[in-house]
Structures are given as C-alpha cells and as structure tokens.
C-alpha cells in the first residue's frame, strides 16, 4: 500500500497522457457523472480480479474549490476588514484587561485564528430568528467566546462594563468564560465546553430538526446547523461519533467548520502528519461533503504557474509541524526552508520579497476563500458538509504568540506586542492609550457602523440569541393514571412496567401525545416497550426498506419516517444528545417536546456525565429514566451493570431533580409533577427517575401522601409506640418493610416505616433551610422537611437503600438528637440472585434488623444480647468479606 503523501513515479508518461486525454474528452462531451462512472468501472474491474485496490481517499493538499469556480465576494471587504479589526482588538483587550486587573485570564489565540471564519458567517450566512423563520443554529467553539463578545459590543448588545467583567460573573454583571446558557440565558444557546460536546450535540440537533419535520411538528424551512470546532477537539470520541450519524442520516442541514490551526493546548495536533488530510479521509468515508480551505488567494498565482506540480508536491511533503514552525518565523525562513528545497520553487518566488512571501496567507484568513466554501456548503444537498479551514493559531499576535506552542495559555502581551497588533490591523489607538488597551467601536453614524448593522438586519437579527417564549402545555390530571394509583392485588409488576403504561397513557393524550419523544439506546425489549414499535413506530429517515424478520408478529420492528421512537442503538452519547435536542426544543424551535430517555441506569450519568452536566447548562427540560437500577436488583449481570451510585452522580447537577420510587403510584405522582413544573410552569430543570426490573405487588396510593412523595419522604406505616424510624427507597424499601415485621415478630420492637422517594431533594431542602437560618439570625429558625417529619417521633433512624451509604448520608445532618445509621451497597457489583446480593451487600431484611438492634443497644434502649440473638437467629456470617474490599 502506498501512503497518501508519497510521490509515485510515472514509468510511462506518454501512456498516462493518453488516459488523461481520454478522460478529458469524456468530461468535455458527457460531463463529470459519466467520467466518474467510467472510473468506477475501471476500479470495479480491478477489484473483481484481484480482490483489493489501493484507492486514494484524500484529494491533493490544495483548496477544494478552484479559482475559476469562485463566486465574487458580495460584501464590502474594506469595511469588513475594518470591523474585523475592531472585533479582534476587543477580543484581545478584554482578555488582557481581565488578566491585568483580576487575574481571571482568558484565551486570545483561538479567536485570533478563527476571526475570519466567524465574520464571514455573521456578515453573510447566519440567519437570525424572525416571525416567519426560526433561524439558523450556530454552535460557537468555546475558546472563541471573547471574539463573540467583541462583536456583540459593536452591536450594542454588551456594554463596556460587561466586557470588563469578563469571567467575573458572581456580581451579576459579568460575561461567562465560555458559551453557557445557564449563566447567560438570553445570549448563549449551546454549551460547547468541554471539548467534544459541540460536534455531537450539533449533529444530533440537526437530526432532531429532521425528526420534527418528518413528524409534521415543524415545517421545513431550510435552516442550517453550523458547528465551529477545533482540530484538537476532533480527537474526542464524541466528535467521531458525530461523523457517523451525520453521514448516515445525510444531514445536509449540518455544516461543520473545523478550524485547523494545527495546534492543540500543548503543541501540534498532528506534528508528524497532516490533520486536514486525516480529517478529509474520515469525513469522506463517512459520507460527508468535504471542502478544504487551505491556501489564501496569494497562492493562486503561484499554483497557476506550477506547471510541473512541484509546488503541490512540496505542499504535500511538509507535515503540520513544519507549517506551524513556518508561521512562527519570517519570510526569509519560509523562502529557505519551504521553497528552498527545490531550485525550481526558489525560481518561482524569485520576484517576491521576503515580506510578500510572509504575507502568503492560510485559507481560513482569506474572506474570499471562506465565503466560497460557505456558499458551496449551503447549496449542497444530500450530505452534511465539513469545511476544513487552515489557519494560524494566534494570528496577529506576532512574536507574542503567533504559531507558538505556548499561545493557548497566553493571557498577557507586552506593550510592544500590543503596539504591533495595532499596527498590523491598522487601528487608531494612540501610543499613550496602549497601556489602557481601550475597547474600540466605529462611530454610530459611520459607514462601518451602518454597514455592520445592515448585514445583521438583512439576515434577520442577532446571533447568538436565546429565545424562550413558548406556550405552556396542557397536561393530564393525576386521575389519568388511575391504574397506577390502584392496588395491583396479587399481580406482580415492576416500576419499569408501570412507567411503560404511564408512557402509553401519555402517548394517547390528545393534547400531549404527539409531543412525547421516547428515546431508547437499543434496550426497548429489555424494558418491555416493544408494544410501542407497531403503535407509534421507530423513526427512520428513509422509512423501512426491508421486510422485518418479525413482520408477522404483533409487536414487529416497524420503522417509518414519521416514527415517534428515537432508537439510537448502542450509543448512549448519541441518545442523550438527542434527548438534549428534544429537551431544549422549546428554546431552539419554539416547540415544547416532552422527551423520555430510558436506559440502563449504570450507563447513564457514569457513561455520559459530561453531557448530562451540559444538559443542565443548556436548561434542558425532560425526563431521564434509569432502568434496571440498584446494585442488587439487576440479577446476573455483575460489576459493570449493577448501579449503586447513579443517584450520587445525579445529585451533583443542581437542576436535576432525582427520585428513587418503589411503587407505581409514586412514579405516577412524580412524572405528573415533573410535567407540571417543566411544561406548565416552565422551570429549567430536568428529572432523573430510577426504575426497577423486579416484579412485586403494588399497593394503592394512601390518602394525602402526594406532598410527601414530591418532597422526598412520607410515612408508609406508623405505630403509636414506635421505637425506631426505618426508611428505605427503591427495591430496598420492601426489605425495610419486611425488617419492620421481623422486629415486631421476633423482638417485639415497633417501628415506623418511611418511603424516602428522594434523599437528594431532602438534602437540598435541608441546606436551603440552613442557609436561610444563617442569613436571618434574628428570625425564628426554620426547620427542614426531615425535621418536620420526625418531630414527635422517637428512636434512632435507620436508612437502607440499594445505593452507596453516601446516598442515605445526605440527610444525616438534618436528623438531630438521635442516632443515624446508613446501610448501602458500597463496593463493586456482583453477579448473583437478588437475595444473595442483598445479603452480600448487607442491605437485606436481616441486616436491617441487625443494624436497628445495634442502634437501639448503643442508645441503651435494649440489651446487647438482642443483637447477638439476631446474628444467631438469622444465620449471619460475622466473618464474611467486607463487600467494599472484594
């Protein structure tokens, strides 16, 4: 196999010319499709006989769009260069001023490399939201935020005081370090940091837009999703996942603009290779339309004179480490080390000065080249487009950081470097003002200001801008879930089954049904959802082009363009990205959808925690359902599947409301309240609810427990002479109930049993009360909900859950004046039966009894012989392994 950048020798130039002349003849008489067909036939002929063929998957290291196919630039380049200079300066100034006065820093080099990529888009392509058009969606590369603020300052949307408060948000007048809708809810639309989140969420956003159109929830408007990405972040697995879905789904509404400045945070992205060629091969293989913007217009004349192809060969020979180094040097160095390898190339630039050679730019810094790439991208049909734009990191920073490995961390520039920056971009800043680094904008009545405003007006308004005005939904009353509120009798069901029935009720609701978005990562049958296949269908952009194997069955695998289920395959990152798109639809599409993403709970927050955090940042509204939850509840799977900590992980996300219900009625109350809060009151929160695959009978909902269910705890059973308070959630609540019965039968100890539906919400309530009391020392102290529930009750508190002890420990600070015992499933999961696992992790009914007796004995309320009796009675192995140590 011949490597892509190798130069292959021609043994018979005459024969080669004859073949090329033949192809040229076909091109001129019958066009490119016929020529490509003939070439494909030749390749197929060879492969059929020899079984393999080395085919080049990359194109030469030159611009994809030739000069003779370029469109004339539609804007006033002189004015745009002027406004571009203002924005560049302001982006630099706000970082330098922040570093000078507060030390909070910022990044200069990324936007410096991408300024033209953004400005051409803002001036000519990015369409804002209007009354008749929903607007394009633009994902801004996180480290470019200073430039976006600099532009907003020129637009009059951000004040000088706000620029001075860059990265100083606590006072309420600052600007967030990166795009964060949670912190700037009227400005930023999409969180794109940490790196890799932008590509995958943008790709699934584009797919969700198509989903809405296929289901007739939104009209096709020709909207585009633009994602600005860095070449370094494309190494993230999420970035590569985005490649697959974009090509497979033929998302021609998606445009990736990859800023190939060849540098990541510490050094070159691919110092020993060519990152643009690598990306081209990846994206082309995935079915994307790739446009390379490598060289600025200054190279056109040289390439035209390159009759031998030696310049193109030299361009291919150099690796990215060379190209980065060239831009950290000067024109003389480039002449010697780039052109100087071959005498013919030195002759090619003999009439150029070193300064002229130095000014030969990268394609991403040439507005004309960038415009043509964008114009081709928006015209292209049937494929997503990826624009690979070569730039220089730190462009314009000169010796202070241009093309240097350290430029990502640069927060400061010396006086001479600032002066050089000013002179390079022709800005009018007096020498005596340089120390102040003033912000710049054109005069309000200037030609630049009028042009600048007119461009955005022509494109429909400002971008980015986040919109939230949307009509609240009409949700069903709790009585709609009457089946879940009733006693199941002897019929045993799981809470997962109860959820599927609740979902079925919602899908049939005349007001809400079509807005429900079920999302599953290839586990529908595990969760008992296969009945929905035929009922509402599985979404597929091409419908169903085959006869499914189970076509004769009632619940066959039905795919359709207007299918409602988003079946994501074994792809949790993609599934939650679809969920993020659906859960922010109210803002991005002016339509409130109700997404339910159900997954193995172990493969939720642990697997995609960064995306779950980003969902909170994006102000997502929706339901996450962690099925097969609990360390001991999922039988036979073991260490990697048994979840004993998803509630710990969900608890760290401030806007995530988490519940671990045991009974169907609890689940119905929680889901109904979640819909009220998110889709009627429009709170920017989302819900995480764990579901079980253990079947057992469910009681009817007792009177008056709704408030307790939602606040986090309520009494399930009470005894007037209760000596201890037993609490549990999820599957272990039933062990707590059984333990209460054993205590009464075997030891004549009475207890109250509490269903603790949300230890996380109880903790948050307790901390809120503590904070209020801290800040209001002269007022009557408030009491937490836990304290209110336990008021008038006696005895220690024993809490048992199917999660780590830390989960129960959340309420320890709010249990005052009594002993508190937490039982949990710390340690790695094991594969076994539920009964064995609960004994192994010491959360079964016998260990709950033992822990209760020990607490009572420690308080001097019973003798210690009772503890020993329990060990003997229940056959507890006191020498068993500590589950944490296994």
Language-model-detected regions and their locations in the chain:
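Thiamine diphosphate
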Residues: 2, 168-191, 211-222, 240-440, ...
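N-terminal amphipathic, basic-rich helices that act as targeting or association modules
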Residues: 2-155, 421, 492-509, 513, ...
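Cofactor-binding active-site loop characterized by glycine-rich and histidine/acidic residues
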Residues: 69-70, 74-87, 91-101, 107-249, ...
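Active-site metal-binding loops of divalent metal-dependent hydrolases
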Residues: 225, 230-233, 260, 391, ...
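Residue-level marker for buried hydrophobic side chains located in beta-strands
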Residues: 227-228, 256, 519, 625, ...
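A structural-propensity feature for long, helix-poor, extended segments
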Residues: 227-228, 234, 610-631, 636
């Amino acid at each position: 196999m011949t490597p892509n950048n190798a130069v292959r020798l021609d043994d018979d130039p005459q024969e080669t010319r004859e073949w090329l002349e033949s192809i040229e003849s076909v091109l001129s008489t019958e066009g490119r499709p016929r020529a490509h067909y003939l070439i494909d036939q030749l390749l197929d002929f060879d492969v059929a006989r020899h079984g393999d063929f080395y085919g080049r998957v990359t194109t030469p290291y030159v611009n994809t769009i030739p000069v003779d196919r370029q469109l004339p630039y539609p804007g006033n380049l002189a004015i745009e260069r002027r406004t571009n200079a203002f924005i560049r300066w302001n982006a630099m100034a706000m970082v330098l001023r922040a570093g000078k006065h507060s030390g909070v820093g910022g990044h200069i080099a990324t936007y410096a490399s991408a300024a033209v990529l953004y400005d051409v888009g803002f001036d000519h392509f990015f369409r804002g939201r209007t009354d008749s058009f929903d607007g394009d969606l633009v994902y801004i590369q996180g480290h470019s935020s200073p430039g976006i603020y600099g532009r907003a300052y020129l637009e009059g949307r951000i004040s000088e005081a706000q620029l001075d408060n860059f990265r100083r948000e606590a006072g309420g007048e600052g600007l967030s370090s990166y795009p964060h809708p949670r912190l700037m809810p009227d400005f930023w639309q999409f969180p794109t940091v940490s790196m890799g989140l932008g590509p995958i969420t943008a790709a699934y956003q584009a797919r969700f837009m198509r989903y809405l159109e296929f289901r007739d929830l939104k009209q096709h408007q020709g909207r585009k999703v633009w994602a600005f990405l860095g070449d370094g972040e494309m190494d993230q697995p999420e970035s590569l996942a985005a490649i697959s879905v974009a090509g497979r789904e033929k998302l021609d509404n998606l445009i990736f603009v990859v800023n190939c400045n060849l540098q990541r945070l510490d050094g070159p992205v691919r110092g020993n290779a060519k990152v643009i060629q690598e990306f081209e091969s990846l994206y082309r293989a995935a079915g994307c339309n790739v446009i390379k913007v490598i060289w600025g217009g200054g190279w056109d004349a040289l390439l035209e004179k390159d009759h031998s192809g030696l310049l193109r060969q030299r361009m291919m020979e150099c690796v990215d480490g060379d190209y980065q180094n060239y831009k950290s040097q000067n024109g003389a160095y480039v002449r010697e080390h780039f052109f100087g390898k071959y005498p013919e190339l030195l002759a090619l630039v003999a009439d150029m000065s070193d300064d002229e050679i130095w000014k030969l730019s990268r394609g991403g810094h040439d507005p004309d080249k960038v415009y043509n790439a964008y114009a081709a991208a928006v015209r292209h049909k049937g494929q997503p487009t990826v624009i690979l734009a070569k730039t220089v990191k730190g462009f314009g920073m000169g010796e202070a950081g241009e093309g240097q490995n350290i430029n990502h961390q640069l927060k400061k520039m010396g006086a001479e470097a600032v002066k050089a920056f000013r002179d390079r971009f022709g800005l009018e800043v007096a020498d005596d003002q340089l120390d102040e680094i003033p912000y710049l904008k054109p005069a309000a009545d200037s030609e630049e200001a009028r042009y600048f405003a007119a461009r955005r007006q022509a494109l429909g308004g400002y971008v980015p801008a986040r919109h939230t005005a949307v009509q609240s939904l009409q949700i069903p009353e709790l009585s709609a879930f009457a089946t879940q509120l009733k006693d199941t009798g002897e019929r045993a069901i799981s809470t997962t089954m109860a959820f599927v029935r609740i979902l079925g009720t919602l899908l049939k609701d005349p007001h809400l049904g079509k807005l429900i978005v079920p999302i599953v990562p290839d586990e529908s049958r595990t969760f008992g959802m296969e009945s929905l296949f035929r009922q509402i269908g599985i979404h597929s952009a091409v419908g169903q082009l085959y006869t499914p194997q189970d076509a004769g069955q009632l619940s066959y695998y039905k795919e359709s363009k207007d299918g409602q289920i988003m079946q994501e395959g074994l792809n949790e990152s993609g599934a939650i990205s679809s969920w993020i798109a659906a859960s922010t639809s109210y803002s991005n599409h002016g339509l409130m959808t109700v997404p339910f993403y159900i997954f193995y709970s172990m493969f939720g927050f642990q697997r995609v925690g960064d995306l779950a955090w980003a969902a909170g940042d994006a102000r997502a509204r929706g339901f996450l359902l962690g099925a097969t939850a609990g360390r001991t509840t999922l039988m036979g799977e073991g260490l990697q599947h048994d979840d004993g900590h998803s509630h710990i992980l969900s608890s760290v996300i401030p806007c995530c409301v988490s519940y671990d219900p045991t009974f169907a009625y609890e689940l119905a109350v929680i889901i109904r309240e979640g819909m009220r809060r998110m889709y009627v009151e429009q709170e920017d929160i989302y819900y995480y609810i764990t579901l079980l695959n253990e079947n057992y009978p469910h009681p009817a909902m007792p009177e008056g427990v709704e408030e307790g269910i939602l606040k986090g705890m309520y009494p399930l059973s009470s005894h007037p002479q209760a000596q201890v308070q037993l609490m549990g959630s999820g599957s272990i609540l039933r062990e707590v109930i059984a333990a209460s019965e054993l205590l009464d039968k075997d030891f004549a100890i009475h207890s109250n049993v509490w269903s603790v539906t949300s230890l996380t919400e109880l903790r948050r309530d307790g901390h809120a009360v503590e904070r209020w009391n801290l800040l209001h020392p002269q007022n009557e102290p408030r009491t937490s909900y836990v304290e209110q529930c336990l008021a008038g009750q006696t005895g220690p508190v024993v809490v048992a859950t199917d999660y780590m002890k830390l989960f129960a420990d959340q309420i320890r600070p709010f249990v005052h004046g009594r002993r508190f015992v937490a039982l949990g499933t710390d340690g790695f999961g094991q594969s076994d039966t539920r009964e064995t696992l609960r004994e192994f992790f010491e959360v079964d009914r016998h260990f709950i009894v033992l822990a209760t007796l020990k607490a009572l004995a420690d308080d001097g309320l019973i003798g210690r012989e009772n503890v020993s009796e329990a060990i003997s009675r229940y056959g507890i192995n006191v020498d068993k392994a500590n589950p944490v140590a296994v």
